[in-house]
């Protein structure tokens, strides 16, 4: 931000640079934390970083390795995708989009997938994340999730299920998207297209 830019609501920390500009930590939901550490200290000082799982964008893996990871813990597919100790960086929005794209329900158990379904889930995971990055992520109606320059993303206009409850499924056109609660989080899916 430029120093003259108005300070947004929920700005918790502002760092002003000597050569101009500011870095602002804006956290409306107060999920975030800020730490100061050297590169060598970062994982020892910030315990959460040492337990992060694989980053599927920065460190691609084979679908076979993904399958081993998937089967290493018995849980629902949505819980697996959003478990940061397994795969880093996938939140609620992208978990729903990945599951829809792969044709799999959120409540399927990790151990129930066939080899073909594992390959499909992995392909969807990679493709959805890269597509979301291409469109600068998802900026929802509350204006959250913008880039470092305050520019909104546009992937939300490509959402197939997330935040589209009671709207027709874009794939089957026979059913409306359903919204349910799972672990206190909204989950969106198509009862026809996802098995």
What are these regions (language model features)?
Residues 1-195:
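Structured catalytic/nucleic-acid-binding cores of DNA maintenance enzymes
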């Amino acid at each position: 931000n430029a120093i003259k830019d108005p300070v947004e609501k929920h700005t918790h920390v502002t760092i002003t640079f000597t050569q101009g500009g500011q870095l602002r930590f804006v956290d409306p939901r107060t999920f975030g934390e800020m730490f100061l550490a050297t590169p060598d200290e970062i994982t020892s000082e910030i315990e959460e970083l040492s337990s992060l799982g694989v980053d599927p964008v920065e460190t691609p893996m084979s679908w076979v390795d993904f399958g081993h990871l998937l089967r290493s813990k018995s849980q629902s597919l949505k819980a697996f995708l959003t478990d940061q100790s397994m795969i880093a960086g996938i939140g609620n929005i992208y978990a729903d989009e990945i599951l829809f794209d792969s044709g799999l329900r959120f409540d399927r158990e990790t151990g129930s997938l066939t080899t073909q379904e594992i390959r499909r889930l992995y392909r969807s995971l990679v493709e959805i994340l890269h597509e979301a990055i291409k469109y600068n992520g998802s900026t929802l109606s509350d204006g959250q999730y913008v880039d470092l320059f305050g520019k909104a993303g546009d992937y939300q206009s490509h959402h197939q299920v997330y935040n589209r409850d009671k709207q027709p499924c874009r794939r089957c056109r026979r059913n409306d998207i359903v919204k349910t609660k799972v672990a206190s989080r909204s989950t969106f899916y198509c009862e026809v297209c996802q098995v």
